[in-house]
């Protein structure tokens, strides 16, 4: 049996118990893939992470990210929460307000802004993204599983499949009320995601000026609705960026978790260059809710 420091971090909130929790286990180099997966299944959170020594010189640490069912190459809220945990614990120190995370998706640069924990925002740049093709049949099946009105698409851009670590089908609805009124059929939605090799569906609609309400559904990995989803927010950034006709920079906030009695907030910045490449940055706050030791 080995002893490991452990923190449970609430992400996309600085109040505690209002965002999305991630379990962070330190000094996990001696844990096997099987052990990490077993622990993630036991914590039963949407993601559990394991901090290891980096294998790339530029990185401050290596992060393994697990859902209860599988390992992910990248995920947003575990990235922000784990960065907060390693800095708060003194595991590593930011250099010029930067931390470099190594994960299966490659190197992820994080920026830390703010002097005090309650004022600190941690943001990451999406390590990569791909806009993929998907079938009209699959989109129709998702719309049916979510109970989306048939005429919604005349008011917004069409759905887009985006791979930014996980694969999200991103759907825009006319407004936040439409998003909150969705009543998903999770079994049907899970089957569509399984058939098409997606992790899930992220839906968003306008809440106000430069703000959106969003919901992310991933029943295939036993996360019917994620209280706050960083990669989902990043996919929304890619979706919005891909619709821009000229080079531009824009930013907006995303509210998430409303239907789960949470109050999660993320900030998204999008830079679209003259060659149509898109840089997306997702930021959030975090707070330690549980700290102690685990015995494995």
UniProtKB/Swiss-Prot annotation:
What Gene Ontology molecular-function terms does this entry list?
isomerase activity
Q: Name one Pfam family in it.
A: PhzC-PhzF
Q: EC class of this enzyme?
A: isomerase
Q: Where are the transmembrane segments?
A: none
Choose any GO biological process term that the UniProt entry carries and state it: regulatory ncRNA-mediated heterochromatin formation
Q: Which cysteines are joined by disulfide bonds?
A: none
General function of this protein = May have isomerase activity. Enhances target gene silencing when coexpressed with antisense RNA.
Protein name, entry field: Antisense-enhancing sequence 1
What gene is behind this protein?
A: aes1
